Protein backbone atom coordinates (compact mmCIF):
# COMPACT_ATOMS: atom_id res chain seq x y z
CA UNK A 1 0.00 0.00 0.00
CA UNK A 2 0.98 3.66 -0.27
CA UNK A 3 2.05 4.33 3.31
CA UNK A 4 2.01 7.97 4.51
CA UNK A 5 4.00 9.23 1.54
CA UNK A 6 5.48 12.73 1.76
CA UNK A 7 5.96 14.65 -1.47
CA UNK A 8 6.58 18.10 -2.94
CA UNK A 9 4.02 18.67 -5.65
CA UNK A 10 5.78 21.18 -7.90
CA UNK A 11 8.87 18.98 -8.36
CA UNK A 12 7.13 15.57 -8.22
CA UNK A 13 9.57 14.63 -5.48
CA UNK A 14 8.74 12.09 -2.75
CA UNK A 15 11.16 12.77 0.08
CA UNK A 16 9.74 10.03 2.35
CA UNK A 17 8.09 6.94 0.89
CA UNK A 18 8.43 3.49 2.45
CA UNK A 19 5.33 2.09 0.75
CA UNK A 20 5.10 -1.63 0.17
CA UNK A 21 3.71 -4.90 1.45
CA UNK A 22 3.58 -5.07 5.23
CA UNK A 23 1.53 -4.39 8.34
CA UNK A 24 1.34 -2.33 11.49
CA UNK A 25 -0.71 0.25 13.36
CA UNK A 26 -1.44 3.75 12.14
CA UNK A 27 -2.39 7.01 13.87
CA UNK A 28 -2.65 5.55 17.37
CA UNK A 29 -3.42 8.39 19.81
CA UNK A 30 -0.67 8.98 22.37
CA UNK A 31 -1.85 12.07 24.18
CA UNK A 32 -2.21 14.69 21.47
CA UNK A 33 0.28 12.92 19.21
CA UNK A 34 -0.29 10.20 16.61
CA UNK A 35 1.94 7.10 16.61
CA UNK A 36 2.40 4.82 13.61
CA UNK A 37 4.47 1.61 13.54
CA UNK A 38 4.96 -0.69 10.56
CA UNK A 39 7.10 -3.47 9.12
CA UNK A 40 7.34 -3.33 5.33
CA UNK A 41 9.08 -5.70 2.93
CA UNK A 42 11.70 -4.01 0.75
CA UNK A 43 12.87 -6.41 -1.92
CA UNK A 44 13.83 -10.08 -2.15
CA UNK A 45 16.48 -11.97 -4.11
CA UNK A 46 18.57 -15.14 -3.95
CA UNK A 47 20.56 -13.77 -1.00
CA UNK A 48 17.58 -13.04 1.22
CA UNK A 49 15.02 -10.32 1.85
CA UNK A 50 15.02 -6.74 3.03
CA UNK A 51 12.60 -5.06 5.42
CA UNK A 52 11.88 -1.58 6.76
CA UNK A 53 10.91 -0.99 10.38
CA UNK A 54 9.08 2.34 10.18
CA UNK A 55 8.18 4.40 13.27
CA UNK A 56 6.54 7.83 13.20
CA UNK A 57 5.23 10.26 15.76
CA UNK A 58 3.16 13.12 14.36
CA UNK A 59 1.29 16.17 15.64
CA UNK A 60 3.94 17.17 18.18
CA UNK A 61 2.93 20.70 19.14
CA UNK A 62 5.54 23.44 18.85
CA UNK A 63 4.51 27.10 18.69
CA UNK A 64 1.27 28.59 17.36
CA UNK A 65 -0.01 26.77 14.26
CA UNK A 66 3.18 24.69 14.05
CA UNK A 67 3.71 20.96 14.54
CA UNK A 68 6.55 18.46 14.27
CA UNK A 69 6.57 14.95 12.85
CA UNK A 70 9.54 12.64 13.42
CA UNK A 71 10.14 9.41 11.51
CA UNK A 72 12.75 6.67 11.80
CA UNK A 73 13.27 3.96 9.23
CA UNK A 74 15.57 0.99 9.86
CA UNK A 75 16.32 -1.09 6.78
CA UNK A 76 17.44 -4.58 7.80
CA UNK A 77 17.69 -7.94 6.08
CA UNK A 78 17.46 -11.66 6.62
CA UNK A 79 19.84 -13.80 4.59
CA UNK A 80 18.94 -17.09 2.97
CA UNK A 81 20.82 -20.27 3.87
CA UNK A 82 23.56 -19.73 1.28
CA UNK A 83 23.07 -16.01 0.75
CA UNK A 84 25.20 -13.07 1.81
CA UNK A 85 24.74 -9.31 1.54
CA UNK A 86 27.70 -6.93 1.34
CA UNK A 87 25.59 -3.97 2.44
CA UNK A 88 24.93 -3.30 6.12
CA UNK A 89 21.64 -2.17 7.60
CA UNK A 90 20.86 1.53 7.23
CA UNK A 91 19.07 4.20 9.26
CA UNK A 92 16.92 7.02 7.88
CA UNK A 93 15.83 9.75 10.31
CA UNK A 94 13.44 12.55 9.32
CA UNK A 95 12.07 15.62 11.03
CA UNK A 96 9.25 17.63 9.44
CA UNK A 97 8.09 21.00 10.80
CA UNK A 98 4.72 22.06 9.38
CA UNK A 99 3.71 25.71 9.77
CA UNK A 100 0.17 26.78 8.92
CA UNK A 101 -0.25 30.41 7.90
CA UNK A 102 -3.22 32.62 7.12
CA UNK A 103 -2.30 32.57 3.43
CA UNK A 104 -0.95 29.02 3.06
CA UNK A 105 1.58 26.70 4.68
CA UNK A 106 5.31 26.05 4.90
CA UNK A 107 7.30 22.89 5.66
CA UNK A 108 10.92 22.44 6.67
CA UNK A 109 12.35 18.94 6.32
CA UNK A 110 15.65 17.62 7.73
CA UNK A 111 16.74 14.07 6.85
CA UNK A 112 19.86 12.03 7.63
CA UNK A 113 20.74 8.59 6.24
CA UNK A 114 23.50 6.05 6.83
CA UNK A 115 24.94 3.18 4.74
CA UNK A 116 22.62 2.52 1.76
CA UNK A 117 20.41 5.41 2.83
CA UNK A 118 23.33 7.85 2.53
CA UNK A 119 23.21 7.97 -1.28
CA UNK A 120 19.43 8.33 -1.19
CA UNK A 121 19.57 11.39 1.07
CA UNK A 122 22.26 13.03 -1.08
CA UNK A 123 20.01 12.83 -4.17
CA UNK A 124 16.50 13.74 -5.24
CA UNK A 125 15.50 10.17 -6.09
CA UNK A 126 15.79 8.60 -2.63
CA UNK A 127 12.79 8.29 -0.33
CA UNK A 128 13.37 5.27 1.90
CA UNK A 129 12.51 2.21 -0.20
CA UNK A 130 14.55 0.21 -2.76
CA UNK A 131 17.54 -0.09 -0.44
CA UNK A 132 20.68 -1.28 -2.27
CA UNK A 133 22.61 -4.12 -0.56
CA UNK A 134 24.46 -5.28 -3.67
CA UNK A 135 27.72 -3.64 -2.61
CA UNK A 136 29.57 -2.16 0.36
CA UNK A 137 28.23 1.32 1.13
CA UNK A 138 28.63 0.82 4.85
CA UNK A 139 30.59 4.01 5.63
CA UNK A 140 28.27 6.25 3.62
CA UNK A 141 26.28 9.10 5.13
CA UNK A 142 24.06 11.72 3.58
CA UNK A 143 21.65 14.46 4.55
CA UNK A 144 19.29 16.98 3.02
CA UNK A 145 17.48 20.10 4.19
CA UNK A 146 14.34 21.15 2.33
CA UNK A 147 11.96 24.07 2.68
CA UNK A 148 8.79 24.20 0.61
CA UNK A 149 5.26 25.52 0.69
CA UNK A 150 2.35 27.15 -1.09
CA UNK A 151 0.89 30.58 -0.33
CA UNK A 152 -1.59 33.13 -1.63
CA UNK A 153 -0.02 36.38 -2.80
CA UNK A 154 -3.24 38.29 -3.33
CA UNK A 155 -6.67 37.68 -4.77
CA UNK A 156 -5.40 36.27 -8.08
CA UNK A 157 -1.87 35.01 -7.33
CA UNK A 158 -0.65 31.80 -5.68
CA UNK A 159 2.92 30.50 -5.53
CA UNK A 160 4.65 27.26 -4.66
CA UNK A 161 8.37 27.07 -3.88
CA UNK A 162 11.12 24.60 -3.00
CA UNK A 163 14.58 25.24 -1.57
CA UNK A 164 16.89 22.27 -0.99
CA UNK A 165 20.46 21.43 -0.04
CA UNK A 166 21.74 17.84 -0.25
CA UNK A 167 25.17 16.38 0.54
CA UNK A 168 26.88 13.10 1.32
CA UNK A 169 30.23 11.36 1.69
CA UNK A 170 31.57 7.88 0.85
CA UNK A 171 28.51 7.31 -1.32
CA UNK A 172 27.86 4.21 -3.38
CA UNK A 173 30.33 1.43 -4.00
CA UNK A 174 32.82 3.92 -5.50
CA UNK A 175 32.88 6.00 -2.27
CA UNK A 176 32.31 9.41 -3.85
CA UNK A 177 31.37 12.71 -2.22
CA UNK A 178 28.67 15.03 -3.52
CA UNK A 179 26.74 18.19 -2.73
CA UNK A 180 24.03 20.12 -4.54
CA UNK A 181 21.36 22.74 -4.08
CA UNK A 182 18.09 23.53 -5.82
CA UNK A 183 15.77 26.53 -6.06
CA UNK A 184 12.31 26.30 -7.63
CA UNK A 185 9.45 28.83 -7.75
CA UNK A 186 6.06 28.43 -9.43
CA UNK A 187 3.78 31.51 -9.34
CA UNK A 188 0.31 31.20 -10.84
CA UNK A 189 -2.08 33.91 -12.00
CA UNK A 190 -5.79 32.99 -11.92
CA UNK A 191 -7.85 34.65 -14.65
CA UNK A 192 -11.09 33.14 -13.40
CA UNK A 193 -12.37 30.01 -11.64
CA UNK A 194 -11.04 27.65 -14.31
CA UNK A 195 -8.25 29.36 -16.28
CA UNK A 196 -4.76 30.15 -15.01
CA UNK A 197 -1.32 31.09 -16.35
CA UNK A 198 1.60 29.33 -14.66
CA UNK A 199 5.24 30.42 -14.57
CA UNK A 200 8.06 28.25 -13.25
CA UNK A 201 11.79 28.81 -12.78
CA UNK A 202 14.20 26.20 -11.44
CA UNK A 203 17.94 26.02 -10.82
CA UNK A 204 20.04 23.05 -9.67
CA UNK A 205 23.82 22.97 -9.24
CA UNK A 206 26.49 21.12 -7.32
CA UNK A 207 29.49 18.84 -7.62
CA UNK A 208 30.28 15.13 -7.59
CA UNK A 209 33.88 14.33 -6.64
CA UNK A 210 34.92 17.92 -7.46
CA UNK A 211 33.25 17.84 -10.90
CA UNK A 212 30.69 20.64 -11.25
CA UNK A 213 27.22 20.26 -12.74
CA UNK A 214 24.33 22.67 -13.14
CA UNK A 215 21.12 23.28 -14.98
CA UNK A 216 18.15 25.63 -15.16
CA UNK A 217 14.61 25.57 -16.51
CA UNK A 218 12.05 28.25 -17.33
CA UNK A 219 8.45 27.31 -18.13
CA UNK A 220 5.31 29.21 -19.11
CA UNK A 221 2.02 27.33 -19.26
CA UNK A 222 -1.60 28.12 -19.94
CA UNK A 223 -3.89 25.81 -17.97
CA UNK A 224 -7.53 25.02 -17.33
CA UNK A 225 -8.66 23.22 -14.17
CA UNK A 226 -11.79 22.30 -12.23
CA UNK A 227 -11.50 25.17 -9.75
CA UNK A 228 -9.21 28.08 -8.98
CA UNK A 229 -7.09 26.46 -6.25
CA UNK A 230 -3.38 25.73 -6.70
CA UNK A 231 -4.33 22.08 -6.07
CA UNK A 232 -7.37 21.99 -8.40
CA UNK A 233 -7.45 18.87 -10.55
CA UNK A 234 -7.95 17.59 -13.20
CA UNK A 235 -5.96 20.14 -15.16
CA UNK A 236 -5.09 20.52 -18.86
CA UNK A 237 -1.83 22.39 -19.42
CA UNK A 238 -0.19 23.71 -22.62
CA UNK A 239 3.43 24.59 -21.90
CA UNK A 240 6.76 25.69 -23.28
CA UNK A 241 10.04 25.09 -21.42
CA UNK A 242 13.53 26.46 -22.02
CA UNK A 243 16.24 24.17 -20.60
CA UNK A 244 19.90 24.99 -19.97
CA UNK A 245 22.90 22.80 -19.14
CA UNK A 246 25.24 25.26 -17.42
CA UNK A 247 28.33 23.02 -17.39
CA UNK A 248 28.10 20.74 -20.44
CA UNK A 249 26.49 20.33 -23.87
CA UNK A 250 24.23 17.40 -23.05
CA UNK A 251 21.10 18.19 -25.08
CA UNK A 252 21.03 16.06 -28.23
CA UNK A 253 24.32 14.40 -27.33
CA UNK A 254 24.73 10.89 -28.75
CA UNK A 255 26.84 8.18 -27.08
CA UNK A 256 27.74 4.70 -28.21
CA UNK A 257 27.38 1.54 -26.12
CA UNK A 258 30.65 2.24 -24.31
CA UNK A 259 29.68 5.79 -23.35
CA UNK A 260 31.87 7.57 -25.90
CA UNK A 261 30.30 10.71 -27.37
CA UNK A 262 29.78 10.24 -31.11
CA UNK A 263 27.74 13.39 -31.78
CA UNK A 264 28.07 16.64 -29.86
CA UNK A 265 25.10 18.25 -28.22
CA UNK A 266 24.20 21.79 -27.19
CA UNK A 267 23.89 23.60 -23.89
CA UNK A 268 20.20 24.51 -24.29
CA UNK A 269 16.92 23.21 -25.63
CA UNK A 270 13.29 24.27 -25.96
CA UNK A 271 10.33 21.92 -25.68
CA UNK A 272 6.57 22.39 -25.97
CA UNK A 273 3.80 20.05 -24.98
CA UNK A 274 0.36 19.46 -23.54
CA UNK A 275 -0.67 17.32 -20.60
Swiss-Prot record:
Topology with respect to the bilayer: Multi-pass membrane protein
UniProt superkingdom: Bacteria
Gene Ontology BP term (one): polysaccharide transport
Keyword terms of this UniProt record: Cell outer membrane, Ion transport, Membrane, Porin, Sugar transport, Transmembrane, Transmembrane beta strand, Transport
Site (Greasy slide, important in sugar transport): 105, 231
Pfam families from the UniProt entry: LamB (PF02264)
One Gene Ontology MF term: porin activity
Annotated site residue numbers, Important in sugar transport: 14
GO CC annotations, alphabetized: cell outer membrane; pore complex
Record flagged with keyword DNA damage: no
Reaction(s) catalysed by this chain's protein: beta-maltose(in) = beta-maltose(out)
Induction trigger: By maltose.
Coiled coil: none
Compartments in which it is found: Cell outer membrane
Keyword Cell membrane: no
Assembly and interaction partners: Homotrimer formed of three 18-stranded antiparallel beta-barrels, containing three independent channels.
Function: Involved in the transport of maltose and maltodextrins.
Protein name: Maltoporin
Organism whose genome encodes this protein: Vibrio parahaemolyticus
Gene it is expressed from: lamB
